[in-house]
Amino acid sequence: MKTLGILAISFILIFFSCRKDSFITSGDARVTITADTLKYDTVFVSTGSTYRTFKIINENNQKLRLSSLKLMGGAASVYKINVDGIPGTQFSNLEIEGNDSLYVFAQVNVNPGTANLPFILRDSIEISFNGNKRLVQLEAWGQNAHFFRNKVIAANETWNNDLPYVILGSLLINTNQTLTINKGCRIYVHADAPILINGTILVNGLKDTANRVYFQGDRLDEPYKDYPASWPGIFFQPSSKDNVFTYAVIKNAYQAIGLQDLPPNANPKLTLNECVIDNAYDAGIISINSSVRARNCLISNCGKNLFLVKGGDYQFTHCTVATYANRFIDHRDPVLTVSNYIGINNVPAAEDLTAAFRNCIFWGENGLVDNEVFTAKNNTKAFNVTFSQILWKVTSTPAFINPPTGVISNLSPKFDSINTSRNYYDFRLQKGGSPAINAGLNFGVTTDLDGKPRPAGLPDLGCFEKQ
């Protein structure tokens, strides 16, 4: 009897071992493919996308044999695939253990062409098993572009909106030279490519969305297209002068704009008219003893929105400066810091400071900040800071400033729509509900960030006029 029991157990073990080692051949085998389409956002010619992936899951206890897995476009396809790390265009007799899976990775590389409009690139992966055929579609948008690697503007140059501009390595504008960027241009900047301005840059956008000029990172695929710190930023060196940005959008940088030292002439080093600076990881504008004139600008969701230190000369009119902590940005710093000094090796270096903020909103939520406006003064240099017609979030009036006028403290501006979970922000004002409506004075600004008219009487605070 003991011998019979041992034989029975052995038979059972062998039976299940054979089942596990056998292949399921039924056309009804339970197989899950985790995607029916792999989509890629805009991919520039001569550059590759990131990999997209899907799994083929064998939900059976027995092994599954894929008779073939092939890239339908073959070797001529713009797509490249690999299966569990092995590259190729066609694979045969792939085995998947019971209740196991394999990974398929796909990447697209766009060949150069002449089209200036985005074009669609399609292919598919065919998976065959047990008489079944399944297709996973591949779909990408290709885009030709001007590619510049370590580009130097050594003579005056103009960029027009014929193709996007992709910056690799760096872009340098030499002293006394001017780069003019006309309406509708799109500038995509690689992760290691700062824009360095020793000379002058003129950005001539227009109010319509299609005619604004955009600066952003060159990763346009999900989820990277929304990441801050995707590229270094735009940096104005001591010799730079007479820079003007009109209807420009600068987003997803590390430091969107950095300025050092006053210009060599009496004009502002940088003028910003109707511009958006958004989602900068460290700072929207960081300025060290420099000069900025800003009108109708939105500086939103940055590590430090405005960081103006070691003096300088600043004027911000009808600007909305706001940050809501979200999954990309920890709101740990005030949206506005103004100081006439900076510590260098624990020694304060100070310069004269003049700053005026008129018809502006300074607001933040969901972070660690109670005072959204911070001021600091060194008594060895001038400190002349004025706030007129302001809505701000503070626990007390900032120190050292001139007596402010027309102040609204700690009342929510009631922006139109804020949804941090969806990463959606509309900083226009709620009609009839915002205390910023009709709270301004006429400082000669006749339109808003949308290009819509402001009244001759009492305008709204911030960059948007409620229509």
Regions found by a protein language model. Give the residues of each.
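Beta-solenoid repeat scaffold
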Residues: 152-160, 173-186, 192-219
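Buried hydrophobic-core signal for structured, non-transmembrane domains
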Residues: 51-58, 121-128, 234, 248
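C-terminal motif of bacterial Sec signal peptides marking the signal peptidase cleavage site
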Residues: 14-17
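Terminal connector regions
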Residues: 112-144
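C-terminal accessory segments
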Residues: 405-467
